[in-house]
Amino acid sequence: MRKLVAAALIGVMTMGLTVCGASAADFDSSEDITVVSREDGSGTRGAFIELFGIQEEQDGEKVDMTTDEANITNSTSVMMTTVADDEYAIGYISLGSLDDSVKAVKIDGAEATVDDINDGTYKIFRPFNIAIKGDVSDAAQDFINYIMSKDGQAVVEENKYIAVGEPEDYTSNGAEGKVIVAGSSSVSPVMQKLKEAYEKVNDKVEIEIQTSDSTTGMQNTIDGICDIGMASRELKDSETEAGLTATVIANDGIAVVVNNDNPIDELTSDQIKSVFTGETTTWADLEK
């Protein structure tokens, strides 16, 4: 049975799982691997299972083959806390969100870095999209113009993401008002940085960011609940058929992360697939 990891329980789990003085020397490779995945609807999960082949074609439909034993987390931050608190855990997050609370493993010999993505050696990355439905307000359009400008793409690069396009100088259209941006918890951190930078050059527009997941963000945009949706994946056919238009605002790597006390520093793509489909269940199995 899948286990939902609720943010409210993290503090309790931390007290129960933390071992004083734990280190790589104390790591018991015979222990079961704690597989940690994102929830259904997460764009990061969708990109992850596609990039590692953790899906199968069944009756014309793509089926997610993530093990039923996976712990399910509902955001990037909960994923990171869960892996940081469990010595035997493995998960995956946006590269732009990576910090020293967890350790990113090399994949097929390549490091999860912007440089390795740019030179083609690290192949686990996906687009960050924003989406709109039809015409948007002048305020929403002005914010989009800023995101895609030289200034906006500089913010993208400063925060460990990969800039896109051939940006031009930003010129405000003089808009005023409020813009609601909703969706992916992976896109949300860079969107927050873009909001902060934008409001310094146009304080007449208020940007509100609502963090959930990619699918919810797209549905909210379709329903007119928000002005701009955020997705950490390509849009689905059903979403574009509902009237959404996507724009890539950045590219982002997906880092496979383990606890800092885990001595493993590198895995192959096949090993990661084996772990997340439940074929490999202990850390010792990865050493064979």
Predicted regions and their residues:
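Exported/periplasmic ABC-transporter solute-binding proteins
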Residues: 4, 21-288
